[in-house]
Amino acid sequence: MRKAGVWGLLWMLFIEEIQAAAEVFEEKCTLAEGQTLKVSCPTNTNIYSNSQKAWQRLKDNGEVQTLAITEGSSQVRVGKYFLEDIPSEGMLQIQMANLQVEDSGLYRCVILGPSDPIILFHPVRLVVTKNSLGTPASDEYPCQVSVQNPTPLPVTTKLRPRPRPRPKPVTQPIPTSADRLSSPGFTVTPTNVTHVNRAPGISIIIPAACGLLSKTLVFIGLFAVTHRSFAS
């Protein structure tokens, strides 16, 4: 109960602050006689879709005059005042046609409730001037006071080019000499080979020396045997 009372008090203070701020700021609109005032008041669809909405005039003596009320209908016309409640757009459209100088004053659009009304938009200070030509002014450029519900800005997505995949380095084993020799299609060309020049007479001298040595040994042996036989 205490929490509910606190929240209720805070809500009342919040509403009073909004109303005080709304009374400070005014939208001024100057029109000539015969023209039409058009005002768009944003509403909260989730909260006030079924609430009564009204167009009021604030007199100089502080009196509030209710000019038109949406009595369960989306469109209401009372004399020169036309109200259209559009819950799907969260907007209350108001028109005052065939303006006269005596229509000059301060106006506001509100939500009617059990207590004080909830102000939907800044009060509009309407100033109606005499038409110098004496004929009704054209409605081609009526004064429009409106506030559109904030809409999210479009999000622009920039497509970035996808980076190309880099080729992965392939590690190959270093071929050995045996692999080079055994691999087909390779020709082995020996390099840095020292050429040895062989003398052609070596193959003849060595056998001749061996034969001469053996003959010399035989001759020495025969000489020793002969010398021993003569000595005896």
Curated annotation (Swiss-Prot):
Location relative to the cell: Cell membrane
Cytoplasmic side: 225-232
Principal location: membrane
Disulphide bridges: C41-C109
Tissue expression as described in the entry: Detected in bone marrow, tongue, lung, liver, thymus, spleen, jejunum, ileum and lymph nodes.
Keywords recorded for this protein, A-Z: Adaptive immunity, Cell membrane, Disulfide bond, Glycoprotein, Immunity, Immunoglobulin domain, Innate immunity, Membrane, Receptor, Signal, Transmembrane, Transmembrane helix
The protein's role, per its UniProt record: Cell surface receptor that plays important roles in innate and adaptive immunity by amplifying inflammatory responses. Upon activation by various ligands such as PGLYRP1, HMGB1 or HSP70, multimerizes and forms a complex with transmembrane adapter TYROBP/DAP12. In turn, initiates a SYK-mediated cascade of tyrosine phosphorylation, activating multiple downstream mediators such as BTK, MAPK1, MAPK3 or phospholipase C-gamma.
Record-given protein name: Triggering receptor expressed on myeloid cells 1
Species of the source: Bos taurus (Bovine)
Lineage summary: Eukaryota, Metazoa, Chordata, Craniata, Vertebrata
Record gene name: TREM1
